[in-house]
């Protein structure tokens, strides 16, 4: 067992020390302690009893027994604790608020970076280190620049694709609108006019008056140079060119008159067929040329046969 060799803890010396102390100062310093006089009620039996009455602590006097001397013997429990443990959180907040200064690239650096980016979008570590050494930057800054540049490139590609799709949709919409307009115009042109009169007859009425003389038309018998069967028209080459021209004009006039008469008898154009041809009474004798023999053969008493032959010829 350890022996306590603190001589000032002797009962007589302790009582004399406590009697000489100013308890008011002790109470004011430590408010939680009621009074130091309570310690006098405890009896301390020292292990060593070799101290005599004259062997008390001569250095402990009422003047020297004070709060300071007792406090010196107490060891501070926070002596080994570092100072930074009890610092406030203001320093941590300041460190969090401190951000890295934004890197500002020069035009020469950007030019060199863009040149390498045009060659490859994903440079390896050796290329990045060489480029960083060349343009006086760190490899980390070069790597971050390439990451941002790739993101910008992808964004530009998406914007270009969206613009191309919008332009394509706009052109297709315009084409469809123009085709619809053309179709509507064609539909309007093909629709008949509901407010107008009857349209033209798709099957025009054939005019039979020119071939054999229509009903009501003048007969070519009265034409100059015409003659009966016994007249002088039997000689084919006698009229000459003037007579042939006059006969042709007379025949044209007769055909026009016959056509007009046929239309009048039918009640207007497109209302019905013209009446059948009337019998041919006579044919001008002055018509010469290669058809003279045919025309002379038509001058026969049988009018029905002559009309049939002439209608088949024309």
Curated annotation (Swiss-Prot):
Transmembrane segments: none annotated. One of its GO terms (molecular function) is DNA-binding transcription factor activity, RNA polymerase II-specific. It comes from the Eukaryota. Residues 98-157 bind DNA. This is Paired mesoderm homeobox protein 2B. Expressed in neuroblastoma, brain and adrenal gland. Signal peptide: none annotated. Keywords: Activator, Developmental protein, Disease variant, DNA-binding, Homeobox, Nucleus, Transcription, Transcription regulation. Belongs to the paired homeobox family. It is found in: Nucleus. Residues 162-173 have a biased composition (Low complexity). Pfam families: Homeodomain. It is linked to Central hypoventilation syndrome, congenital, 1: An autosomal dominant form of congenital central hypoventilation syndrome, a rare disorder characterized by abnormal control of respiration in the absence of neuromuscular or lung disease, or an identifiable brain stem lesion. A deficiency in autonomic control of respiration results in inadequate or negligible ventilatory and arousal responses to hypercapnia and hypoxemia. Neuroblastoma 2: A common neoplasm of early childhood arising from embryonic cells that form the primitive neural crest and give rise to the adrenal medulla and the sympathetic nervous system. Interacts with TRIM11. The keyword Transcription applies. Residues 162-246, 259-289 are annotated as: Disordered. Residues 174-191 have a biased composition (Basic and acidic residues). Residues 210-240, 264-275 have a biased composition (Gly residues). Its main location: nucleus. Changing residue 100 to L: Confers susceptibility to neuroblastoma; found as germline mutation in a neuroblastoma family. Involved in the development of several major noradrenergic neuron populations, including the locus coeruleus. Transcription factor which could determine a neurotransmitter phenotype in vertebrates. Enhances second-messenger-mediated activation of the dopamine beta-hydrolase and c-fos promoters, and of several enhancers including cAMP-response element and serum-response element. Changing residue 197 to D: Confers susceptibility to neuroblastoma. GO terms for biological process: autonomic nervous system development; brainstem development; cell differentiation in hindbrain; cellular response to BMP stimulus; cellular response to carbon dioxide; dopaminergic neuron differentiation; efferent axon development in a lateral line nerve; enteric nervous system development.
